[in-house]
């Protein structure tokens, strides 16, 4: 063995020596942009040491100066706009955009997102120090199936249906990677047509399909969960179709493996999924990245326990096919190779995929060669992109109820706005968001629309409590002194000082420093002041922190979380003040990396009575109650201490009790209520359907959400959104959250009566479907023995105003007793003027009739008698159907 190692070392030295003799003015093969990405990657691989290869397989890949390799950050986010990288256009959350059922518009959105991404990458490149979230690999889209509304990260997905998820996911990938809407390479911008063939076809950005393969909560146990015995039919018909299509039709550059185990093997070391399915069956040529810390889960005490050490975990992941690690375990690659646990050829295979991706981006080439680098900086958060954010926000708002035609409202009415989400700009962004240059809350959107008319705002309650809060920060008569150090230990001379006169609400969003001269990350701060009360008061100290903090009151340490990393649960501590008795407050803050947040206030909490609330409402014609939940309550692995929430997920589906009580009280008092629900998931709002005359599902609508909601409320925009998930009546309608089988889940298998069905959404007009006809046409799929079909039907706007309907096509195989009740296979947005009738044609390719064949263990076109349904929702579609025999 020693002789073998010595021989490899000598060969490596000879290769490096030969390369070193290359003339300085001659391009090396890997530096030549006219060669293929594969040829360049092969050449560069031959020049790298094992230690250098290891560094390049980490998510934060450092520069290797001797070979001119620039630094690269693989971890970047763009679920609904460029995230965590300064100012950017903040589009509505993914679920909101899915509700538009408009993949063509979604493609425009992600073309805009990739424009901003390219412009931002150039800014970072010119700075000479590319940080996390500033490169061109984006871990987007999330094409997991939102199988259970309790999952806190469902807001990142495109809903519960495989077909809708696939259509929307493809639009995202094509927009991000600079491909045409149907997945073909686009002509290089700014390059004459005559020169296109001579120009390397660079990828605009790298998209990533995540989380492969069966992943949708719970958040609290994702690092230990083992999914066992999932039926093959559920796997292939529900959980895998979107991934397969994004690989084969969208040519997605990356796939991210998930945290959990499947049948005992962690997803990031699961050879069945990574090697057999992804690479061998689907032909995936791109790279596989781990989720962050997923490989560490193999060996960390109390987690998966499939490895004893980081070296062993690394060997398992690399050998299975995980090319890139977000984490720290891959630092042990040299030890694993030395121990014979990994063959270096495996390392080379993985690294080649990473290098090919970077060469396709133009990461090694001069800017003048890469046309995407010419996208100007002024596209970032430009007006056109903000208008696009408003457009898709309008299309994704779903009108769930409009009893007695309360909507649309008009400017002449007296409107009172109420509720905890009405004036919350942070809620608009959802999770994994960027930082808008400006945003409009729903309250402000309504006020803007009713200029010249007073619009009163009554908070009435918080999201989860029957109380309202008032800042008492002014009791710091001299403010709070702020001191900053560019280290995490508060050592040495401060780099800045300041005096905080109002509640502290600081973040490094938009690359904003806490004070001039302070680092964006890796710094510390101290805020200190004296409260001077003029009366006895019971208050609370409220803090929102990302990363570590310590709270000291009159010398006593009340909170000590200095070692915390990441967003911590809101800190709320009681504070009793006595008139004339000063209280000294000190807050120490430690910023470790990435996001910095420091929020601090002294709050007076009061509980308004029903009489006080009604007095504020007065004789209003309508109360617009803007409630729901927020990204602080649902999201990725959150520390939450509120009834109904656990670890970022929900334990029930109901609207929080405090809001429910206010809406019921308003109804009992005879007030006409419009309930605007903001959430990333379905809410079981049975009482609200009785106590509110109108209900809008507004999700988390992005930076221009206030304008979009106002336009729908007042009728300037006719709502056309359709639900991408089922709204259930109760959590009791659902199977166990840990059960991944599809039995009684989603509209495809749920046998109960939903509150609002999948695909549902009202309009201010009405539509009527004619009897459909089905025509057999020659299959477009080469070599297919099955036929394609064309479905035709009339659609008429039977109302008094223009509107857009999303016509939905579902199928069911009649003899499939264990199969779906129905499955979405096509949809089309159709805009019609009042009274207009149009013949609508929708293609149903032969793959629409594909399903799992248990006899052959394959997905194939299954012969039989099928019912084909068409309508405005999964429920309405049952009214208009036709049968067809598929051979």
Task: Identify the role of each PLM range.
Residues 19-540, 544-851, 858-876, 885-887:
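Glycoside hydrolase catalytic-domain context in secreted enzymes
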Residues 1-26:
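Bacterial Sec-dependent N-terminal signal peptides
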